[in-house]
Design a protein with these regions (language model features):
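Chalcogenol-based redox active-site neighborhoods
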Residues: 2, 8-166
């Protein structure tokens, strides 16, 4: 985990200075390894969430599912990441008709590279709910460090439109 002094974004994480997104490799549901390069040329909505099929994570995933067509129309792809295994992801995806990619990061390598691991309530450590908007050139353009699951999808659509108009 980065020390406080080496983070490349503001403490509030609301408006980062664009910087290269950390490369990653993670397993998809079909067992193939996906990397950041697989998404080059598209905007990526990369979101980290604590656990499949829990209340907040389900609300967030369904919020993104419901606006996926709007996100796709903006040339973006949604990618969700947690430490859950492929079997858990498959059940979560089927139960809630999720229409986007889910990646498994059981060893937390990608999660930690994106600084989505840290202290949570009551001093416990775990996966932090965070979303990164990555440009087609692989630059992190926006970080949501404190995500409210309800309505997050609409928030992402509005921000993608704003970034693309700039």
């Amino acid at each position: 985990m980065h020390s406080q002094g080496t983070r490349r974004y503001t403490k509030s994480m609301m408006t980062p200075t664009p910087y290269p997104a950390p490369d990653f490799t993670a397993l998809s549901l079909d067992g193939t390894t996906r990397s950041l390069a697989d998404f080059r040329g598209k905007w990526v909505v990369l979101y980290f969430y604590p656990k499949d099929d829990t209340p907040g994570c389900t609300i967030e995933a369904c919020s993104l599912r419901d606006v996926r067509d709007d996100i796709a129309a903006l040339g973006a792809e949604v990618v969700g990441v947690s430490a859950d295994d492929a079997s858990s992801h498959e059940k979560f995806k089927a139960k809630h008709s999720l229409n986007f990619t889910l990646l498994s990061d059981p060893d937390l390598t990608m999660i930690k590279a994106y600084d989505a691991w840290g202290k949570k309530q009551f001093g416990r450590e775990g996966i932090l709910r965070r979303t990164f908007l990555i440009s087609p050139e692989g630059q992190v353009m926006k970080i949501y460090g404190r995500v409210t699951p309800l309505g997050h999808g609409e928030q992402i659509v509005a921000e993608l439109k704003k970034l693309q108009a700039a």
